[in-house]
Amino acid sequence: MQKKLQVEAIEHGSVIDHIPVQQGVKIIRFFNLTQTNEKITIGLNLATHTGQKKDLIKVENTFISDKQANQLALFAPHATINQIKDFKVVNKFQVQLPDSFIDVLACPNSNCISHHEPVDTRFYVKKKSTLKLKCHYCEKTFDHLFFSELD
């Protein structure tokens, strides 16, 4: 059986692979990738070699930083980042869930002081397996799904 690319190759840039189904569009929104002039290719519900489905994002002429890669773990904890130069993978790494997120997310608790005072939001990762985050200020713990729709 001949292999066939489901999404066009890029010359230079980043490929975010192994994104869970229905998370690709959320990642595009979260990172404001629609605000760039670079070509963005997104594959949704692509078949994997195991017969499962995944999403995939390719961003030309843009390289994902370590900080951005770690933020991706909120949406895709098993995603990999491929850095492409001259159509070849020059670096490949898996996202790593950081111990904390600073000034990335808004607290879902509307009574949290972070909504009323000029402070940077701060969340600590309390449980990595099911991804639970604890707010530094109100000390409430939230499932990561509370954050998946935030802009």
Curated annotation (Swiss-Prot):
Its cofactor is Zn(2+). One of its GO terms (cellular component) is aspartate carbamoyltransferase complex. SUPFAM superfamilies: Aspartate carbamoyltransferase, Regulatory-chain, C-terminal domain, Aspartate carbamoyltransferase, Regulatory-chain, N-terminal domain. One of its GO terms (molecular function) is metal ion binding. Zn(2+) binds at residues 107, 112, 135, 138. Keywords: Metal-binding, Pyrimidine biosynthesis, Zinc. One of its GO terms (biological process) is pyrimidine nucleotide biosynthetic process. Binds 1 zinc ion per subunit. It holds the Pfam family PyrI_C. Belongs to the PyrI family. Involved in allosteric regulation of aspartate carbamoyltransferase. Contains catalytic and regulatory chains. This is Aspartate carbamoyltransferase regulatory chain. It comes from Psychromonas ingrahamii (strain DSM 17664 / CCUG 51855 / 37).
